[in-house]
Amino acid sequence: MLAEGRQVYLPPPPPSKLPRLSGTDPTDGVVTMAAPSPLVLGLGLGLGGSGSDSSGSDAEASAATVREARPPSALTFMQRQELEQQVLIYRYFAAGAPVPVHLVLPIWKSIAAASSFGPQSFPSLTGLGSLCFDYRSSMEPEPGRCRRTDGKKWRCSRDVVPGHKYCERHVHRGRGRSRKPMEASAAVAPTYLPVRPALHTVATLATSAPSLSHLGFSSASKVLLAHTTTGTTRAT
């Protein structure tokens, strides 16, 4: 056989196998199996003659048949995106977490655009800015799971506290806390008491009354009155 000007030798096909069953007659129970066809790669190199072309066309025909038998997708690309968004909203509902505004906003816009009353009839979300969009929450596959991680692969498996991003164990972590318990210090404000004469001063003046006549006081009561007046003046 010639292929592209060169003679290529193909080995002859193997002989047919004749398995025999045990019996008296050697011709009884002879089963003749068809010899296998020679190997055809179908690489388009000219080996195998027209067989390669026919095998290639058969493969293309079978692939076309598979494509025709496969049912077309029932959803478009936009419909699949909307379905994924609704599934994500349902996960937030199931976890008891608040749904981010940017997930609800496209639904609100589609309803407002399809309504005959116009967007003015739905003022609840009118005027929302970009601050209401939480893009990190939109990429969260498990919104009800605690977000505490070690920065690598580990992540806490507990459920979040409603209204927070972390579980009960990690919700207060990271806040500035004192290691020592705070004790209430009872600060006593300084009080100013009026100056009063001591009792021993009165007793001393009373016992020394006879010897005070040379100082110009006629009695001990006058001396006590003068001492009290002087102490009050100093206090003021």
Curated annotation (Swiss-Prot):
Query: What is the annotated localization of this protein?
Result: Nucleus
Q: Where is this region: Disordered?
A: 1-27
A single GO molecular-function term is: ATP binding
Statement: the UniProt record of this protein carries the keyword Transcription: yes
Where would I find the WRC domain in this sequence? 140-184
List this protein's GO terms for biological process. developmental process; DNA-templated transcription; regulation of DNA-templated transcription
Pfam families, sorted: QLQ, WRC
Q: Which residues form the QLQ domain?
A: 74-109
Q: Which InterPro entries match?
A: Gln-Leu-Gln_QLQ, GRF, WRC_dom
Q: Which SMART domains match?
A: QLQ
Task: Give UniProt keywords alphabetically.
Answer: Activator, Nucleus, Transcription, Transcription regulation
In chain numbering, where does the motif Bipartite nuclear localization signal fall?
145-155, 173-180
One GO cellular component assignment for this chain's record is: nucleus
Give the protein family. Belongs to the GRF family.
The record's domain comment reads:
The QLQ domain and WRC domain may be involved in protein-protein interaction and DNA-binding, respectively.
What this chain does, per the record?
Answer: Transcription activator that plays a regulatory role in gibberellin-induced stem elongation.
Q: Which PANTHER family match?
A: GROWTH-REGULATING FACTOR 5, GROWTH-REGULATING FACTOR 9
* Name listed for the protein in its UniProt record: Growth-regulating factor 12
